[in-house]
């Protein structure tokens, strides 16, 4: 896409935002889940945000939050969560091929490992991954009912890694005595996606079971390759809530997935494939005191990720990679409403993370696992005080005691001021971040036990304006400073670097603290109900993320676009048909630290439609990448061309 086209799309973002050039922040995203479409849009005061650990009206939140409702998710029709998130403000992603391959999500230019990912409040980040981040490659919509994206440093409440932000995925809960859902679709590249769930609720018990299956022949993960790289994913989930008494209840939840994806190297086709299994479990006891003013939760959360890669061409030892990561967390959380104006949230956590990893080869058929373990005990507290009508102040502290890195204290403050009967909302927040080195960075074959923790400071200020009961515009400026960021450092041959040799044997490289980085940017969001049937929404993000030290001082961080924009228009026809158009622009990025290798800009256009046959049955379809744009998010890795998909939804 040329600069003129980009300027046109950016201008459309501002026009959709209507007369004022002000205000992003958290609410617009609730009022119109960014550009996810009109479906699911609700009034600001009605939206409850749980991403900061306690339900509250979004106009009282001082940070930036995007909320995608179930209606918005269904309207978008996108199976992959990473692609859904990319339609929201400040979010970009990279992927080494098609759905199922390694996928990283960046929020506000932060590293992918600086995003904490949750399912129903349980952390998913894999301690055996290269820098402890979460691979979005296997995360499909499944039984998702809601997605909340909290942007900016959130380490006070969510701990280590919550630097760029938090993504909280909420699974569906039943509201009727018996209800179910079934979605089935098929389309290009031999793709099929089936998902369904059934559950029920009464005064004492609610339950739901869900399953999904995704299959695709795919396309070559190597950009100029000729063989298709397919992907399959099977998912299961379940949840149960039992009300023991009016004040005591039991929660049980679990999510399981198993995926297999073909993948290529960066320089050509291969027959390699990987298998990933992920298990998430939670058990919790909830009890209320003081007529519900004092709510308590004691819980145990467990995640287990197992990954294996195979190369059938290596007959002696086809297994080329074997890793597993586990998180075990005991937690207590309390919320106490002192009065209508003053609320507190506090808790303690004890977490153990473990990982093992090895890389067999024809030269070493059965190497020993590199193993690592870390224990972390934490306590946090947050106070939210509505000082006067419309003005809410929030402050919090977190204390971490890390087995290897000792104690650390973090702080965060925020303010939200609703003016003009809520039509104008001003927000500001400041927070600190802290990330201890991951287990892979410390103990793998590339590990370095001398690593220091990463430290961050971030702040933002924004304003939202509602106009004529038809439009919302928001604007936010953000800034983040980082010290001691950890990067992979390659070793030359021969090398005089002592860390390039372990037990007398040279290695490819190791992790080290090499960098200060800084990021600043502007996020703009707008939505306007042009008519009762036509809704237009848009967002634009400018991100200046760059190195601030060493030989790369002033260079942009790799694979972080400076410009991103989304535009969507949705029309509800009088006879029931719903149609929508979505346009996404991503500016050029650099594929290396020296900024000498460019990955080009691109524009994607998607078209979607749905039609209700009756109250229980709906048909839908979409065209992805309608103009068959050729593009890459990572150099030399392929992306999907034009695709046509159609399906049915059944609700009962």
Tell where the protein language model's regions lie, with residue ranges.
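N-terminal periplasmic accessory domains that precede
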Residues: 81-84, 103-106, 115-118, 134-140, ...
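Outer-membrane beta-barrel signature, preferentially recognizing the C-terminal barrel domain
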Residues: 267-288, 323-328, 372-374, 429-483, ...
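Extracytoplasmic beta-strand/coil segments of soluble accessory domains associated
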Residues: 50, 82, 86-123
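N-terminal Sec signal peptide and the immediately downstream disordered periplasmic leader
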Residues: 1-88, 200, 242-246, 281, ...
């Amino acid at each position: 896409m040329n600069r003129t086209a980009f300027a046109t799309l950016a201008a459309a973002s501002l026009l959709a935002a209507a007369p004022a050039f002000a205000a992003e922040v958290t609410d617009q995203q609730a009022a119109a889940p960014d550009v996810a479409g009109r479906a699911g849009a609700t009034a600001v005061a009605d939206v409850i945000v749980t991403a900061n650990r306690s339900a509250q009206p979004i106009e009282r939140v001082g940070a930036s939050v995007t909320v995608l409702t179930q209606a918005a998710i269904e309207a978008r029709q996108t199976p992959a969560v990473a692609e859904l998130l990319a339609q929201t403000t400040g979010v970009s992603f990279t992927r080494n091929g098609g759905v199922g391959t390694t996928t990283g999500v960046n929020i506000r230019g932060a590293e992918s490992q600086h995003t904490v990912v949750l399912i129903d409040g349980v952390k998913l980040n894999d301690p055996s991954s290269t820098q402890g981040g979460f691979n979005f490659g296997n995360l499909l919509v499944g039984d998702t009912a809601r997605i909340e994206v909290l942007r900016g440093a959130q380490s006070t409440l969510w701990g280590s890694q919550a630097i760029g932000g938090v993504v909280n995925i909420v699974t569906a809960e039943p509201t009727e005595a018996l209800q179910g859902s079934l979605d089935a679709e098929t389309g290009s590249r031999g793709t099929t996606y089936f998902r369904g769930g059934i559950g029920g609720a009464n005064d004492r018990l609610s339950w739901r079971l869900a399953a999904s299956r995704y299959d695709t022949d795919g396309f070559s993960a190597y950009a100029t390759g000729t063989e298709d790289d397919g992907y399959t994913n099977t998912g299961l989930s379940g949840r149960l809530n039992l009300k023991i008494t009016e004040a005591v209840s039991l929660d049980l939840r679990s999510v399981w997935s198993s995926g297999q994806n073909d993948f290529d190297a960066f320089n050509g086709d291969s027959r390699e494939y990987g298998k990933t299994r992920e298990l998430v479990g939670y058990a919790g006891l909830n009890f209320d005191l003081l007529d519900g003013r004092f709510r308590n939760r004691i819980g145990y959360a467990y995640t287990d990720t197992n990954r294996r890669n195979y190369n059938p061409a290596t007959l002696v030892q086809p297994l080329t990679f074997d890793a597993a990561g586990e998180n075990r967390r005991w937690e207590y959380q309390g919320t106490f409403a002192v009065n209508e104006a003053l609320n507190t949230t506090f808790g303690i956590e004890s977490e153990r993370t473990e990982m093992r990893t090895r890389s067999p080869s024809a030269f070493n058929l059965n190497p020993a696992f590199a193993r690592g373990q870390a224990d972390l005990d934490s306590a946090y507290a947050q106070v939210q005080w509505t000082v006067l009508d419309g003005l809410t102040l929030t402050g919090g502290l977190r204390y971490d005691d890390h087995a290897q890195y000792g104690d650390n204290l973090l702080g965060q403050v925020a303010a939200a001021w609703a003016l003009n009967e809520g039509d104008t909302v001003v927000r500001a927040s400041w927070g600190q971040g802290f990330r201890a080195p991951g287990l892979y960075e410390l103990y793998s074959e590339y590990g370095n036990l001398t690593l220091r923790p990463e430290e961050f400071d971030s702040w933002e200020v924004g304003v939202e304006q509602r106009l004529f009961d038809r439009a919302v515009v928001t604007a936010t400026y953000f800034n983040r400073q980082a010290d001691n960021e950890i990067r992979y450092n390659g070793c030359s041959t021969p090398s005089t670097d002592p860390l390039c040799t372990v037990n007398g044997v040279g290695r490819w490289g190791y992790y080290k603290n090499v960098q200060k980085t800084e990021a600043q940017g502007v996020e703009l969001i707008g939505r306007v109900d042009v008519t009762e049937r036509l809704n237009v929404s848009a967002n634009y993000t400018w991100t200046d993320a760059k190195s601030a030290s060493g030989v790369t001082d002033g260079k942009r961080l790799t694979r972080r676009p400076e410009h991103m924009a989304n535009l969507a228009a949705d029309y509800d026809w009088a006879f029931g048909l719903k149609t929508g158009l979505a346009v996404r622009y991503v500016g050029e990025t650099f594929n290396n630290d020296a900024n000498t290798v460019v990955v080009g800009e691109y524009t994607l256009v998607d078209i979607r439609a749905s039609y209700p046959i009756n109250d229980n049955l709906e048909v839908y379809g979409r065209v992805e990448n309608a103009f068959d744009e050729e593009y890459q998010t990572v150099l030399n890795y392929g992306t999907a061309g034009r695709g046509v998909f159609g399906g049915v939804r059944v609700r009962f």
